[in-house]
């Protein structure tokens, strides 16, 4: 990519919202590029199954991600692999993205769609030492590499329950550690998890320590005030997410909590910069709401940018 080229639209991210926006802008004949440093699809690639996408009773997250990605490219949107580290608001109709490798991408408008990243339970003793040596964040991606060894899932929400259920088809035993006295996940998901014979749920529990020589071998868990030793080879935390748009701090669009406020057209307080998906301040974060955001931003930009 030439650094002298100016795109009509640059989209930061490659999740459902980003790819939907790319479909609309490229289909509207806007020169579009989307940038991400992970596999296209965003959190879709971590979902073993999706049951609330209209038209598909059940669909694998990876399959849906591929369909989104191919659809966006079919109309000419270009994919750039890279990590955005700075967003510069040069003027209302010119923005510059700086990538980690020093490359710069300029565009008339920018859509921020970088979503959120997993929250890490760093209060667990030795947690950092076992990242990538037992601690992982994607059951679908990494679960198989730990074989049939017992595993821990931390969390009581939808993601924890879904991934725990999926992991039970790989690991010989799955311990689901829930801080509270009950799940907050949807009932249908909880019922599916409870039907698995090799899943044990520990309520009112928290992981305190991780131990092992070269890789994770066991965890110390506080359960109802008593310490329990669980011999496991892997641990997957699903305890919430944090906003992922630090690169936009110099552009003046971030709120104190790290999220971004927009109007009904997905535009931020800075002209020409839009935000969609999970990074927006909103109450409901779902695949459908992200695609809705992407649709709105894509249509608005198609109408506003004159070719």
Curated annotation (Swiss-Prot):
UniProt binding sites for FAD: 36-43, 278-287
SUPFAM superfamilies named in the record: FAD/NAD(P)-binding domain
Cited InterPro entries: FAD/NAD-bd_sf, FAD/NAD-binding_dom, Ferredoxin-NADP_redctase_2, Pyr_nucl-diS_OxRdtase_2_AS
Keyword vocabulary terms for this entry: Cytoplasm, Disulfide bond, FAD, Flavoprotein, NADP, Oxidoreductase, Redox-active center
Domain of life of the native organism: Bacteria
Keyword Signal appears in the UniProt entry: no
Cofactor(s) required, per the database record: FAD
Main location class: cytoplasm
Signal peptide range: none
Alphabetical list of Pfam families matching this protein: Pyr_redox_2 (PF07992)
Subunit structure comment from the entry: Homodimer.
Protein name as annotated: Thioredoxin reductase
Native species: Mycoplasmopsis pulmonis (strain UAB CTIP) (Mycoplasma pulmonis)
Organism classification: Bacteria, Bacillati, Mycoplasmatota, Mycoplasmoidales, Metamycoplasmataceae
């Amino acid at each position: 990519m030439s650094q002298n080229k100016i795109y009509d639209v640059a989209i930061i991210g490659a999740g459902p919202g980003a790819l939907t926006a790319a479909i609309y802008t490229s289909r509207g004949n806007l020169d579009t590029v989307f940038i991400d440093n992970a596999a296209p699809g965003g959190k879709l690639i971590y979902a073993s199954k999706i049951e609330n996408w209209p038209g598909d009773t059940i669909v694998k997250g990876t399959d849906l991600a591929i369909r989104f990605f191919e659809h966006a490219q079919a109309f000419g949107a270009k994919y750039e692999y890279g990590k955005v580290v700075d967003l510069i608001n040069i003027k209302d109709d010119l923005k510059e993205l700086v990538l980690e490798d020093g490359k710069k991408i300029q565009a008339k408008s920018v859509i921020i769609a970088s979503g959120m990243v997993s929250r890490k339970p760093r209060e667990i003793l030795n947690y950092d030492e076992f990242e990538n040596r037992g601690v992982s964040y994607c059951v679908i991606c990494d679960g198989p590499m730990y074989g049939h060894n017992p595993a821990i899932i931390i969390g009581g929400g939808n993601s924890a329950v879904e991934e725990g259920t999926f992991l039970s088809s790989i690991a010989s035993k799955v311990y689901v550690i829930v801080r509270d006295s009950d799940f907050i996940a949807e009932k249908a998901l909880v019922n599916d998890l409870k039907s698995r014979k090799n899943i044990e749920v520990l309520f009112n529990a928290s992981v305190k320590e991780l131990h092992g020589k070269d890789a994770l071998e066991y965890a110390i868990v506080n359960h109802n005030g008593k310490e329990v030793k669980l011999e496991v080879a892997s641990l997957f935390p699903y305890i919430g997410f944090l906003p992922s748009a630090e690169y936009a701090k110099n552009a003046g669009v971030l709120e104190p909590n790290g999220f971004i406020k927009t109007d009904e057209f997905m535009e931020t307080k800075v002209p020409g910069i839009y935000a969609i998906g999970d990074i927006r301040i909103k109450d409901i974060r779902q695949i459908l709401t992200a695609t809705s955001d992407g649709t709105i931003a894509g249509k608005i930009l198609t109408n506003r940018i004159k070719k």
